Each structure stands twice: as C-alpha cells, then as structure tokens.
C-alpha cells in the first residue's frame, strides 16, 4: 500500500496457521528503483485482532494478504480459511513499537479467499480480489464500511492472482508468475445499486 506522502507500507500480515503473535506493517520511504540500494524502515506497526480469543484460533479466519491506506489509516482485509467471508479491520494509531488492536469495521461474504485489494484515488471505491472473482465496493458517503454501498462483481479464470490496483478507469491484476491482466472497471457486473 502507499500513502499520499511517498511512503510504502509493507505488510508482514500472513497468518496461515493462525498462530502468529507478531503481525507487522513496515513503513518506508518509497525508493526510487534505479537509485536506491538500501532503504531504512521509518516505522514498524505491530497489531493484533481483538476478536481472536485464542492462538491458534479454532476457525482459521485471521490470515491476511490484502491491505490499503486511506486518510491516514491502514486497513487490512482478512483471508478466511474456515469460510468465504472477509473482514475489514482498521489500524488507527501508528506508534512504533507499541502493539495496537485492529478495529473491526465490517464483514462480507466474498465467496472466496481474499488475495489483494486497492482503494481508488478518490477513496470512494474499494476493489477486492479473490482467487475466483473481483469485487468492487463503492461507499455512499465518507464511510469505512464499503460493504454497505454499491457492489459490482466479476468472476475470472486465471491462476493464483495475488494483487490488484486501480489504473484510471481500469484495473491491473498480477498473478504469482508475474503475468499482468487488464480489465475495465465498467466491465464488472452491478449486483447492488
């Protein structure tokens, strides 16, 4: 994820077995690819899910691969293994070295495991990638709960797609092999206005 001030957010947020106690997001200055050899971590954000009552959790619902930045806050979308839901959590405070609770915002059945997400430049749209479909959520107001607004969707067939981002009126998707796919936002099917 990136913010408006040239920072790159790197998530060490994977938790396949739901046993991790050290979920971390690193903030660095976004390096210039041809000139930067080494970069320093500006901040480390340690967090936990308050609704994960035991480690490991009996339901494997605390893994994550997707996150985005919006208006000074970091959002993480979970990748459930016990069901096909995702949950959006928000991290409000970025005090380095202090473990902070992630605040649960909303829950939605994506009918698959979430592998990527991005927020549009105007912050009104959230695109969510699963292994079998693309979801587009649009808020009606300045809300954190994208799942209550307009929803569009599109199934796809490509192997192990792991990342998605907005590029104007298009979406760019990449899989584990490095293949890039391009899709017009208008091609998604509206399922709720």
Where do the model's predicted regions map?
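Sequence/structural signature of beta-propeller domains
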Residues: 1-193
